[in-house]
Amino acid sequence: MNTAVLLFSTPMDFARKGVVADISQFLVAHKGSVLHSDDHLDSGRNLLLSRLEWDLDGFDIPTAEFEKYFKPLAERFQIHYHLALTQH
């Protein structure tokens, strides 16, 4: 199975505004199936830290173009992120 892992951080205020839900909806809208999601609130640094992994089977965004599609969402929520590809 080929999967993608999105590691991201964003100011904690955006956690209350649905950033995780919006990212999950973005993935599902592009036929991604979320396999794992882990979140951590770092109140000392005022950050939401998150890891989302999804199955790439059927995902309709080529991984090389992910940044182009994800950029508007990243800018809206001030997201810093890293995308990694894995094989299980």
Where are these regions (language model features)?
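A conserved regulatory-domain signal marking ACT and ACT-like small-molecule sensing domains
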Residues: M1-H88
